[in-house]
């Protein structure tokens, strides 16, 4: 699979956190997987754990 960067959007949509550096993710936060521009309003822990595997 291609490498993708995973960033998490907290309360401020302009504030991004790299999931690789902050695993204390709120389950209600939003995130963007850069590269394919996938966006979601709700985070599922399993989705994040899977996405983290692609963080370069």
UniProtKB/Swiss-Prot annotation:
One of its GO terms (biological process) is virion attachment to host cell. Its main location: virion. Induction: Expressed in the late phase of the viral replicative cycle. It is a single-pass membrane protein. The keyword Cytoplasm does not apply. It is found in: Virion membrane. It comes from the Viruses. Keywords: Host-virus interaction, Late protein, Membrane, Viral attachment to host cell, Viral envelope protein, Virion, Virus entry into host cell. Does not contain disulfide bonds. GO terms for cellular component: membrane; viral envelope; virion membrane. Belongs to the orthopoxvirus OPG108 family. Immunodominant protein. Envelope protein that binds to heparan sulfate on the cell surface and might provide virion attachment to target cell. This is Envelope protein H3. The lineage of its organism: Viruses, Varidnaviria, Bamfordvirae, Nucleocytoviricota, Pokkesviricetes.
